[in-house]
């Protein structure tokens, strides 16, 4: 009943957020915070990949950080719809590929049905309905949709990993790693538990998928590995407004404070010392939380079930880096039932409630940034950029979630020691 109550509140908040965003779009002609400030860029995570899926120098000139599988998945969208890719830029390609995005939208709507079917034993009908609609209209879900990001496929394979064993689990890891490389962390439970057979199978499937998809796509597919390292080390890859749109990790604050535009500002001349100190502390906190969680899993691996290990690793992934993106919070949706079975279930569910709620409707700051073409309304409009409360609240709450699941692992060990003493 506690879980059902939280799900109802989360659904109500998600509906409020959806209505607010739609009303704002109809009245002002663009989406407010937390959606990206560049209103021309709608759906461009998908169409940037689409454009470069049909270019031969994606890994060399563009520096693509997407494994080959992502480009092949996008090509499948074009193949299914029969759309012939055309255009000399990704935005022109978007304008000529409406049926492709309609298919993406259908996949966005169907994916939660797929993983809910896999987890059907975990929910009653009313809870399943609530979880489904939260999964498609909550703020992180709408953010993923507005970006057109392929992460919307990931919850299906996380659920498959959760409810299946052995070969199916190895297959799930292989697909996830080849969609989003940070899922390589899912190898950790296999290593910690000494399940070398399944570890070898998972690595084999992952490498086979990487090599086969890369061979089909591009002879330089291996270049994605150095591209990923350079991507993560860049200090000015994104603008401050992009990073603060829907951050999920404390590392976003460190990135902002170390951004060249901040370092060269009048603010930095006045408060640079304090900014450096705060950025360093935040960076250490972010890294320390991740290391503590992984260390706890290693030390107390014998007392953690597969479900708890998966939860900890997914929470680590969302806290790992600002580059993971705020849409990574949708990875929590297929884990709701697991969170509900843990020691601190009530706290977890409340944290998830706030993480998916439209707290960004509360403005912290705003500035007029001029006129832009808004893709969603098809005209040029004046943009009043707003920094929403979610930019401050979500990374902090997500970090607290990371600390709490780490404590959960420690408590598993402590409980086991109590039983031994008895």
Residue ranges: model-predicted function:
Residues 178-181, 208-209, 358:
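Membrane-embedded alpha-helical segments of transport systems
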Residues 193-204, 344-350:
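Membrane-interfacial entry segments at the cytosolic side of transmembrane helices
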Residues 1-163, 167-168, 197-325, 377-391, ...:
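Primarily membrane-embedded glycan-assembly and transfer machineries that use lipid-linked glycans
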